[in-house]
């Protein structure tokens, strides 16, 4: 795994599949059952990004450093923003511009049904699928002079994050150490939701103690496996039934005195059965790997574009195929070559 990308590269969508943010999101959701933590981390990234864009907009508009310091300490009055009113983005525009870069940005609260693709997302609740279909090249540029983020918009985003993840009454509440949560709640009470470093300690905790360990498990999974666990369950059932049928046909061929030419056809159910059973055991489909594909969700495949991942999967595919051929060949030879006897 020496050539594997860092977790920061995956979280900022700078890497190729299967080590992509979309796949990492699916893994955290299905395997780690910690999707709320990843959602929170992505939304904190968005909070920092919006704050910096807000500061950049103030600089472009000619705000002095003194005014900027006053703004960051939450003492800047609303009259300073009247000059930017014609250039400010609406909240609906913000959801379409900033959401795609960072993934799950509380879309249920921030977007309306007229926003592109948002209505489908609200119905399906599949935020991971929305991540996959987005292309960074199609996102509106944030460097336009006409786009300015206001203080009120930053505070509104912050308020939504606090209410969703730190409110005990919220269904999406994340369980974090009290020493991390209490300062955030105190800022809410004192109306200081526009501070850049408000979520800094939470971000560090999530990255170092939750996301990095999960990412190493994600890497191990992608380097060794290319099947979804739900598919493995189905493959096990199919393989078990097929293998049972192969043994049943093999014994019938022996005790009903069938010729060896006929009994050799037990090769087919043995091959089909053991292929699925061993794929389930290894969570690896060798044919799929040699074709260069990996299963993300049940019956949903994507091309493996990461060279190191593809090389690792191909090596494992040869090993798994060797085991399958050995077991199938041994069973076929036994049931074909054993002398038959009519009972």
From Swiss-Prot:
This is Protein rax1. It is found in: Cell membrane; Endoplasmic reticulum membrane. Disulfide bonds: none annotated. Pfam families: RGS (PF00615). Residues 257-263, 339-343 are extracellular. Residues 1-235, 285-317 are cytoplasmic. The keyword Transmembrane helix applies. InterPro entries: Cell_Polariz_PKAAnc (IPR052246), RGS (IPR016137), RGS_sf (IPR036305), RGS_subdomain_2 (IPR044926). The keyword Ubl conjugation does not apply. Keywords: Cell cycle, Cell division, Cell membrane, Endoplasmic reticulum, Membrane, Transmembrane, Transmembrane helix. It comes from Schizosaccharomyces pombe (strain 972 / ATCC 24843).
